[in-house]
């Protein structure tokens, strides 16, 4: 297991930016590919990290680097930063919804999933894991992601973590079991 500490977070130096974080994720995947060329890769992202993980997966798959990505865990994900802006500020009279061109980050899991599906390689299996009492991400976001997986014919599992808030999905036994079962399924011959 490798946990990436993006620039500007935890003990990493530098300033966080979408481009920098994407470079960090790419460097981590390049390291894993050279150090562990036969490893089973499973990328996991929570909330905005799901957008980062799906974008990293798309880039890795498009570059045709071994080992392939076997799984993508998207914990409390949303479709895109822009869709969250609209979800959080739906009122047309508020100026926030018109500010999407000025967002500093534009991660879009829907676009990343399309890139994965269209890459012509074996796509990873996806685990969608929403928290049913998520106070940040509305249910429409997970519905849109699930529909995107269906539309793209991506293999996916969905596990709703009952009663969990936004950051609680994997601190609950149900979420932990869902992740363990997903990884077991990927590892089965």
Feature-to-residue mapping (PLM):
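Hydrolase active-site cap/lid region
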Residues: 55-115
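Alpha/beta-hydrolase active-site loop signature
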Residues: 6-10, 79, 165
């Amino acid at each position: 297991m490798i946990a990436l500490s993006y620039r500007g977070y935890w003990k990493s130096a530098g300033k966080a930016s979408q481009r920098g974080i994407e470079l960090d994720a790419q460097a981590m995947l390049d390291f894993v590919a050279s150090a562990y060329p036969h490893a089973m890769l499973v990328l996991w992202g929570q909330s905005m990290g799901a957008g980062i993980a799906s974008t990293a997966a798309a880039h890795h798959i498009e570059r045709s680097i071994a080992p392939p990505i076997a799984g993508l865990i998207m914990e409390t994900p949303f479709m895109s930063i822009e869709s969250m802006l609209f979800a959080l500020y739906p009122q047309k009279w508020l100026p926030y919804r018109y500010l999407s061109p000025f967002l500093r980050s534009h991660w879009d899991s829907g676009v990343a999933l399309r890139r994965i599906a269209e890459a012509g390689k074996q796509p990873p299996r996806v685990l969608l894991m929403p928290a049913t009492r998520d106070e940040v991400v509305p249910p429409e976001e997970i519905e849109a992601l699930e529909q995107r997986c269906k539309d793209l014919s991506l293999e996916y599992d969905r596990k709703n973590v009952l009663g969990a808030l936004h950051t609680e999905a994997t601190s609950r036994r149900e979420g932990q079991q869902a992740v363990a079962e997903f990884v077991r399924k990927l590892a089965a011959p």
